[in-house]
C-alpha cells in the first residue's frame, strides 16, 4: 500500500528545511561565541586599482600571496567603496556608516578659510577627529566580545585608542606628524614586528584578536625595493608605471608575511582574513600622481575593489557575481564574531551569503563623493560632488555643485546632466547612454533621492570648473 504525505505536511517541508538551516547557522555562531571566537584580520590596501592583482586578471603585476588567498576565499569581484578617498573610506570601515552620516567627508579642513598653521585650523582638525566619538567603532564593539585589537598603518582619527583599539602604533593628532598615521605608517615598509608581538601577546592571554592592517602601500612615495623595481622596468614602460607595479607586489609580499605570522603559530584554521582597498588608483604615466577618473573620483577606477573573505576551515571557496560594498564589512565582521549587529547600520550582514552560499537580497548599492578639503566641518553637503547608484549592469552618476578648493583638476565636472553607463559592455565608462535610457535614469535617480535627500546642493547642468 502506497502511503501519501498529507498536503499540509508537504507544504510545510520546505519551511522546516529552511528553519533547520537557520538553526544550524545560529548554532555554529553560538559555538564560536561560547567556545573559541575567530581571529579577524582586515587587510586594507591604500591606493590600488581593482584590476591590479593577478587574481583579477592583470597581465603584468605579480600578487602571488593575494592570489592564493583569493583562490581559497569567498571572492566578490564587484566590490565597491562608497567614497573614493582614504579618510572617509577608512572611517566607513571603522563605523559602518556612509561619509554623509559619520561626517568625515574629506581628508582635511579647507585651508581656504583658515591657514594650516593657525589655531583656527588646528581646532577644526580636532573637531573633525572628534566626530568618531559619536560611534561605537568596530574595534570597540569587538572589544566588548573579549577581543584584543591592533591598529597598524593609516589612521586619521587620532590615536589608536581614540578609535577604539586596545593596541596599536598611531600616536595621533595633535602630536607632531600625527595627521594620518605617524608611526603606524612604518608597518609593512619596515617589517611586521609590532603585529608579531601583538599576536604573541594575544596568544599568551588566550584572547581572540582583531588586526587592522592598513599599510601605506602601494601608496606614494613609490619607492619599492630595487629587486622588485627591476622586474617591471622595460624600455617601453614609463618609470612611474614600473614603480607603481613594483609597489603592488611589495604590498602583496607583506600580506604573505602577515599570513605566515599566523600560520606559523597554527592559528590559520581559526582566523578570517578579509581584504578590501580604501580607494582606487590609476597611475599617471607622465608623473608621480594618479590619473583622472581614479582616486577621489566616482568612476570605477576610484570606487571599485575586490572584496574577499578567506577562512578555508569554515567557508567554501566561491567566486560570487553579486554587488557588495565596504559598507557591509562592519555588520558582517560583527556577525562572524558572534556580536550583536546594530539595526542602524546601513550595510548588509553577508554571513549567510559567505557561509551558506545564499543569494544577497539587494538590487542596488550607493556611493557618494566629497571634496578632499572640507568646506564646512558641520555641513557635509557643502562639499558634496557626486552620488551614484549601481543596479546590475547599470550605473547612474549624478554630479553636484559642492565646493572643491584644491584638487580641482581631479573634479572637472564638465559633463552636462546625469551620466549612465552600461558597466557590462563599458567597464571603463567611456560612453554616457543617459539620453538613450531615460527610464533607467529616472528609476535610479529616484533611488538616489530616496537614499537620502539633498537639501542645498544642485546637480551640475554644465561646466563649473571655476565655481566653488
Protein language model annotation of sequence segments:
Residues 192-199, 230-271, 336:
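A long, amphipathic alpha-helix that forms part
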Residues 195-244, 279-292, 439, 467:
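Active-site His/acidic residue clusters
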Residues 37-49, 68-69, 93, 142, ...:
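Beta-strand elements within well-structured catalytic alpha/beta cores of enzymes
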Residues 58-90, 96-101, 143, 148-150, ...:
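Short, structured active-site-proximal loop/turn typified by the sulfatase FGly-forming signature C/S-X-P-X-R
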Residues 97-197, 292, 402:
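Catalytic-site neighborhoods of secreted/periplasmic enzymes
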Residues 281-287, 294, 315, 322, ...:
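C-terminal cap/loop subdomain of S1 sulfatases and analogous C-terminal strand-loop tails that border
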Residues 28-38, 45, 49-50, 75, ...:
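Long, internal low-complexity/basic segments
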Residues 61, 260-318, 325, 346, ...:
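Histidine-centered active-site microenvironments of extracellular/periplasmic hydrolases
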Amino acid at each position: 500500500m502506497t502511503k501519501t504525505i498529507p498536503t499540509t505536511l508537504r507544504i510545510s517541508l520546505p519551511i522546516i528545511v529552511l528553519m533547520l538551516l537557520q538553526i544550524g547557522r545560529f548554532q555554529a555562531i553560538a559555538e564560536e561565541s561560547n567556545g573559541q571566537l575567530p581571529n579577524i584580520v582586515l587587510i586594507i590596501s591604500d591606493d590600488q586599482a581593482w584590476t591590479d592583482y593577478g587574481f583579477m586578471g592583470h597581465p603584468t603585476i605579480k600578487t602571488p600571496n593575494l592570489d592564493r588567498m583569493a583562490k581559497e576565499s569567498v571572492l566578490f569581484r564587484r566590490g565597491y567603496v562608497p567614497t573614493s578617498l582614504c579618510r572617509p573610506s577608512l572611517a566607513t570601515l571603522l563605523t559602518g556608516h556612509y561619509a554623509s552620516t559619520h561626517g568625515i567627508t574629506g581628508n582635511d579642513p579647507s585651508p581656504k578659510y583658515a591657514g594650516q598653521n593657525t589655531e583656527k585650523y588646528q581646532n577644526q582638525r580636532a573637531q573633525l577627529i572628534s566626530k568618531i566619538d559619536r560611534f561605537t567603532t568596530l574595534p570597540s564593539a569587538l572589544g566588548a566580545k573579549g577581543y584584543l585589537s591592533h591598529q597598524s598603518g593609516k589612521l586619521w582619527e587620532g590615536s589608536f585608542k581614540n578609535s577604539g583599539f586596545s593596541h596599536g602604533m598611531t600616536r595621533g593628532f595633535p602630536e607632531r606628524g600625527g595627521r594620518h598615521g605617524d608611526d603606524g605608517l612604518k608597518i609593512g615598509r619596515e617589517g611586521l614586528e609590532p603585529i608579531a608581538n601583538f599576536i604573541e601577546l594575544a596568544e599568551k592571554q588566550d584572547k581572540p584578536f582583531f588586526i587592522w592592517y592598513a599599510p601605506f602601500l602601494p601608496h606614494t612615495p613609490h619607492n619599492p625595493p630595487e629587486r622588485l623595481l627591476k622586474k617591471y622596468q622595460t624600455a617601453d614602460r614609463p618609470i612611474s608605471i614600473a614603480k607603481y607595479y613594483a609597489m603592488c607586489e611589495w604590498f602583496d609580499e607583506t600580506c604573505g608575511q602577515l599570513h605566515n605570522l599566523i600560520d606559523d603559530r597554527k592559528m590559520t584554521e581559526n582566523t578570517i582574513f578579509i581584504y578590501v582597498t580604501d580607494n582606487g588608483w590609476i597611475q599617471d604615466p607622465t608623473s608621480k600622481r594618479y590619473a583622472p577618473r581614479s582616486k577621489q573620483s566616482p568612476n570605477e577606477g576610484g570606487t571599485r575593489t575586490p572584496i574577499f573573505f578567506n577562512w578555508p576551515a569554515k567557508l567554501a571557496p566561491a567566486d560570487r557575481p553579486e554587488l557588495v560594498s565596504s559598507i557591509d564589512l562592519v555588520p558582517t565582521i560583527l556577525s562572524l564574531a558572534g556580536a550583536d549587529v546594530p539595526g542602524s547600520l546601513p550595510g548588509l550582514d553577508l554571513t549567510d551569503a559567505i557561509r551558506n552560499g545564499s543569494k544577497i537580497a539587494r538590487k542596488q548599492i550607493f556611493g557618494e563623493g566629497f571634496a578632499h578639503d572640507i568646506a564646512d566641518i558641520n555641513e557635509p553637503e557643502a562639499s558634496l560632488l557626486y552620488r551614484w547608484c549601481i543596479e546590475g549592469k547599470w550605473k547612474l552618476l549624478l554630479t553636484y555643485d559642492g565646493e572643491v578648493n584644491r584638487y580641482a583638476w581631479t573634479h572637472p565636472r564638465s559633463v552636462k546632466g546625469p551620466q549612465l553607463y552600461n558597466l557590462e559592455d563599458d567597464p571603463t565608462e567611456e560612453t554616457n547612454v543617459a539620453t538613450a535610457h531615460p527610464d533607467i535614469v529616472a528609476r535610479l535617480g529616484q533611488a538616489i533621492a530616496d537614499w537620502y535627500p539633498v537639501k542645498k546642493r544642485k546637480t551640475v547642468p554644465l561646466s563649473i570648473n571655476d565655481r566653488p
